[in-house]
């Protein structure tokens, strides 16, 4: 799933690339074995680029909290982030496989399943993506949020 932009001189392209790199660098903080941006496949780079396009949606939802609590909104956005990620991958032919059968060459990934079936580590990755998109500090309460509002 490619991203066509107007080339290196296009301001959208440079902002998109810079922010996609930032998203990946944020991911590397919780997954130190993740490769550098330069070593990512084009598919993984495009995954980060598509995540950038969803940032404004997350921010709009965050601004319009209404009567819902911060934890409820963060839970909703975290579940939505996981669904966005799953949609991107399944549209490219990826399928679920247990962790012991994970195989990028055959497009098999253990996180391609409903959010409530993920372990806390994988839920936290989705929550950290949301916190990063909203420019909120990564809070130590992410597991608490996950326990209370992400299980619905």
Where are these predicted regions, by residue range?
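Alpha-helical propensity feature that highlights long, continuous alpha-helices across diverse contexts
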Residues: 1-152
């Amino acid at each position: 799933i490619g991203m066509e932009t107007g080339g290196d001189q296009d301001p959208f392209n440079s902002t998109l690339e810079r922010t996609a790199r930032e998203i990946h660098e944020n991911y590397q903080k919780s997954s130190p074995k993740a490769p550098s941006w330069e070593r990512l496949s084009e598919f993984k780079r495009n995954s980060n680029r598509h995540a950038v396009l969803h940032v404004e949606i997350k921010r709009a939802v965050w601004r319009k909290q209404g009567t819902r609590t911060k934890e409820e909104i963060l839970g909703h956005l975290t579940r939505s982030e996981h669904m966005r990620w799953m949609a991107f991958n399944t549209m490219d032919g990826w399928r679920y496989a247990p962790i012991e059968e994970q195989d990028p060459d055959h497009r098999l990934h253990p996180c391609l399943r409903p959010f409530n079936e993920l372990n806390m580590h994988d839920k936290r990755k989705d929550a950290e993506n949301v916190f990063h998109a909203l420019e909120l500090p990564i809070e130590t309460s992410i597991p608490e949020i996950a326990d209370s509002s992400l299980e619905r």
